[in-house]
Amino acid sequence: MRSALPTFDEIWQRKFRHRLLIQAQQFPADTVFLIGCSGGMDSMLLLHLMSELFPHKVRAIYIDHQLQSSSRAWGVFVQNFAQQSHIPFTIQPVIVDTGNLENQAREARYAAFESHLKSNEVLVLAHHQQDQTETVLLRLLSGSGVKGLGAMKEIEQKKNICCWRPMLSVSRQQIEHWVEHLKIPYIQDLTNFDTTYDRAWCRETVWPVLQKRFPKMQEAISRTSILMQDADEILHEVLQQDLNQCGDLNHLDLSRLQQLSLARQRQLLSFWMKGKAIYRPAFEMVERVQQEVICAKADAKAALHWNHHYYVRYQNILYRVEKNKYLQKDLVSNVVSTIELQMDASLQLASGVFQIQPMQMGLSPQLFEQPLQLLPRQGGEKIHLYGRVGHWPLKKAIQEAQILPWLRHTIQILALDNVMLGVFTPKGFWLAQSSYCEAGGWQPNLISDVNYLRVEQNS
């Protein structure tokens, strides 16, 4: 005869269900939960529990990586379970790129999740405590820092995905007992035992040895990940303050950077180089930026490429420049174009957007009636800047204005019949002294620079 008192497992299960309900209150009332279900024991239990606790607010998706002959049948298996439980269901095949199979499959999977998530939906995944511990161990072996050792968070905003992992504190043994008790069917993926994959090797080879020596290892390492998440949050706050003091997303003032301790310099560089990407650069890449760019000779044209950007030093400032933008500096244009201007017209050029506006001193309105030439800079030109004495080499004026070397190719000369009227630059229009200058004239006024243009074109 069964005891009237609840068993330990039943008590724990009730507590877990209650915790699930409490966590769900962090999301808006109209939230729908998209369950990523592979058909494995963990995700099948999660799908069952979520559909019980949140009826009519759950749907499921199976990502078919098409890497195994059985993958399609697994999708049908999950589909049948979902239909029996009246859960809306989607099968999404993906193509996994070559390379590191585990990483590429993960990238394809999350891209598929993102494409299916609606604005009011949260992605719910069945990662458990052993998954978390394996992640920490593998990242430790790959040399990860504080953020990497924080591993997975229970609730995390990842690009455009809000991800919830409610089972991170649940052990695999607890999941096994619960699935057995509820008699939930599931699939056994044999690749989980293939030790050619790092995670399977960790699980099948390393785990038993460590578990035997350290029985509480799983709970301890899982706790460490939480402490690392706390440390990473504090570090992020400090580094954001340092970044605000030393620069912004695109540049760092090296004189201010070097006032920090060496440890904070290294951390800030890593944080800054990451930009809006998911991961920070490798330790070695940060060291290379310090040694090959920051510490290079003053007259050296040092530049280092990483993750679609070049890191370049100019006038004791370290810049982060998009690859295609930086490489354009070597392009020399011979194209001469003709333009006609009128008052208030906008002109989009390589150096920015200019608007024709009235000025106390400017060019004659008579020029509106004539075709003007836009000439590329060839080198050797001289300019008599309005308000200054004598002719100056245009190159010297550009250097004096500290126009960044990789933007100088955008400079164009406005001319009429071989008379220089002015120069379009990323820092504005430079009026040249000529017979066409007069009081109450007009000038092109820079209203958005080349950086703004780049952002607009990529948005």
UniProtKB/Swiss-Prot annotation:
<keyword id="KW-0067">ATP-binding</keyword>
<feature type="binding site">
    <location>
        <begin position="38"/>
        <end position="43"/>
    </location>
    <ligand>
        <name>ATP</name>
    </ligand>
</feature>
<dbReference type="GO" id="GO:0006400">
    <property type="term" value="P:tRNA modification"/>
</dbReference>
<dbReference type="InterPro" id="IPR012094">
    <property type="entry name" value="tRNA_Ile_lys_synt"/>
</dbReference>
<keyword id="KW-0436">Ligase</keyword>
<dbReference type="InterPro" id="IPR014729">
    <property type="entry name" value="Rossmann-like_a/b/a_fold"/>
</dbReference>
<dbReference type="GO" id="GO:0005737">
    <property type="term" value="C:cytoplasm"/>
</dbReference>
<protein>
    <recommendedName>
        <fullName>tRNA(Ile)-lysidine synthase</fullName>
        <ecNumber>6.3.4.19</ecNumber>
    </recommendedName>
</protein>
<keyword id="KW-0963">Cytoplasm</keyword>
<comment type="similarity">
    <text>Belongs to the tRNA(Ile)-lysidine synthase family.</text>
</comment>
<dbReference type="Pfam" id="PF09179">
    <property type="entry name" value="TilS"/>
</dbReference>
<comment type="function">
    <text>Ligates lysine onto the cytidine present at position 34 of the AUA codon-specific tRNA(Ile) that contains the anticodon CAU, in an ATP-dependent manner. Cytidine is converted to lysidine, thus changing the amino acid specificity of the tRNA from methionine to isoleucine.</text>
</comment>
<dbReference type="InterPro" id="IPR011063">
    <property type="entry name" value="TilS/TtcA_N"/>
</dbReference>
<dbReference type="GO" id="GO:0032267">
    <property type="term" value="F:tRNA(Ile)-lysidine synthase activity"/>
</dbReference>
<dbReference type="Pfam" id="PF11734">
    <property type="entry name" value="TilS_C"/>
</dbReference>
<dbReference type="InterPro" id="IPR012796">
    <property type="entry name" value="Lysidine-tRNA-synth_C"/>
</dbReference>
<keyword id="KW-0547">Nucleotide-binding</keyword>
<dbReference type="InterPro" id="IPR015262">
    <property type="entry name" value="tRNA_Ile_lys_synt_subst-bd"/>
</dbReference>
<keyword id="KW-0819">tRNA processing</keyword>
<dbReference type="GO" id="GO:0005524">
    <property type="term" value="F:ATP binding"/>
</dbReference>
<dbReference type="InterPro" id="IPR012795">
    <property type="entry name" value="tRNA_Ile_lys_synt_N"/>
</dbReference>
<dbReference type="Pfam" id="PF01171">
    <property type="entry name" value="ATP_bind_3"/>
</dbReference>
